[in-house]
A protein has these predicted regions:
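Structural signature of tandem alpha-helical TPR/SEL1-like repeats
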Residues: 18-27, 53-75, 97-110, 132-141
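TPR-adjacent "capping" and linker segments in tetratricopeptide-repeat scaffold/adaptor proteins
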Residues: 1-8, 60
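Residue-level recognition of tetratricopeptide repeat
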Residues: 13, 47, 92-93, 127
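A conserved position within tetratricopeptide repeats
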Residues: 32, 77, 91, 95, ...
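Short, charge-rich amphipathic alpha-helical segments embedded
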Residues: 30-51
Length: 141
């Protein structure tokens, strides 16, 4: 009998705890194959596709890692729009790692549609606009 998505997800968490990120990623991918709506599984795919954090900072992912992680993060926020960790990681990837500032503005605008009274998306958008030199546009947010 095949394992359920939840049991496979538990395998992913156990692999992560033991330090085996590759096995964790494999189990997370299997989880979302079993249940494509498993938002934790998609979040695991995103996190474990990226290089591990060292000293509290994310190492710079390559383009392929970033693309795979962003695809998974888009699934997470589609399934669970309240998952702020997915929004935050997506913003970091787009703006800090890929330099896709305009896409970062759209990413945070989508978050504002979900959580209109949350301050973080507004601050992130203002930060991006300042980096682009669009100071006057900051006032219209």
């Amino acid at each position: 009998m095949a394992k359920s998505a939840e049991l496979t997800w538990l395998d992913a968490l156990e692999a992560e705890e033991s330090g085996d990120r590759e096995a964790a990623l494999g189990a997370a991918k299997k989880t979302v194959r079993i249940d494509p709506t498993h938002s934790d599984g998609w979040m695991g795919v995103a996190r474990w596709t990226l290089p591990p954090e060292t000293r509290g900072r994310q190492d710079m992912p390559d383009l392929q890692q970033s693309a795979k992680a962003m695809a998974a993060l888009r699934k997470v926020v589609e399934i669970d729009p309240e998952n702020f960790a997915a929004w935050r990681l997506g913003g970091v990837l787009l703006v800090d790692h890929l330099g896709m500032l305009e896409d970062g503005i759209r990413w945070w605008e989508a978050r504002r549609a979900v959580a209109p009274y949350e301050v973080t998306p507004l601050i992130e958008q203002i930060g991006i606009l300042v980096r682009l030199g669009y100071y006057e546009e900051c006032a219209s947010l």
